[in-house]
């Protein structure tokens, strides 16, 4: 990178936003994989069953809760 660009506030903001976007995409991908493997135990039909839907909802919520706890813990250190 050109050294003069390293102090460009717009570029730094853009890079920070892209890094955050990549982290969110990675988290969603991981959550989808984990919850799918946990909750969808047979070949899915055209709709999720009520138990699959409930499991996916709870799994995603627990995953998000744990992610927030971990982020808070890292930020406090």
UniProtKB/Swiss-Prot annotation:
Tissue: Expressed in roots, flowers, young cotyledons and leaves.
Free-text note on domains in this protein's UniProt record: The twin CX3C motif contains 4 conserved Cys residues that form 2 disulfide bonds in the mitochondrial intermembrane space. However, during the transit of TIM8 from cytoplasm into mitochondrion, the Cys residues probably coordinate zinc, thereby preventing folding and allowing its transfer across mitochondrial outer membrane.
Domain of life: Eukaryota
Predominant place of localization: mitochondrion
Source organism of the structure: Arabidopsis thaliana (Mouse-ear cress)
Single GO cellular component term: mitochondrial intermembrane space
One of the GO BP terms on file: protein transport
InterPro entries named in the record: Tim10-like (IPR004217), Tim10-like_dom_sf (IPR035427)
Coiled-coil ranges per UniProt: none
Disulfide partners: 35-59, 39-55
Protein family according to the UniProt entry: Belongs to the small Tim family.
Cellular compartment(s): Mitochondrion intermembrane space
Motif Twin CX3C motif, residue numbers: 35-59
GO molecular function terms noted in the UniProt entry: metal ion binding
Described purpose of this protein according to its UniProt entry: Mitochondrial intermembrane chaperone that participates in the import and insertion of some multi-pass transmembrane proteins into the mitochondrial inner membrane. Also required for the transfer of beta-barrel precursors from the TOM complex to the sorting and assembly machinery (SAM complex) of the outer membrane. Acts as a chaperone-like protein that protects the hydrophobic precursors from aggregation and guide them through the mitochondrial intermembrane space.
Gene that produces this protein: TIM8
Record note on quaternary structure: Heterohexamer; composed of 3 copies of TIM8 and 3 copies of TIM13, named soluble 70 kDa complex. Associates with the TIM22 complex, whose core is composed of TIM22.
Protein known as: Mitochondrial import inner membrane translocase subunit TIM8
Keyword Transport attached: yes
Keywords: Acetylation, Chaperone, Disulfide bond, Metal-binding, Mitochondrion, Protein transport, Translocation, Transport, Zinc
Modified residues (N-acetylmethionine): 1
SUPFAM superfamilies (UniProt xref): Tim10-like
Keyword Transport appears in the UniProt entry: yes
């Amino acid at each position: 990178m050109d050294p003069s660009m390293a102090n460009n506030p717009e570029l730094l903001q853009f890079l920070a936003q892209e890094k955050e976007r990549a982290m969110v995409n990675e988290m969603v991908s991981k959550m989808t994989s984990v919850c799918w493997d946990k909750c969808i135990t047979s070949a899915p039909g055209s709709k999720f069953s009520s138990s699959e839907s409930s499991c996916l909802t709870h799994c995603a919520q627990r995953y998000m809760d744990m992610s927030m706890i971990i982020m808070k813990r890292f930020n406090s250190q």
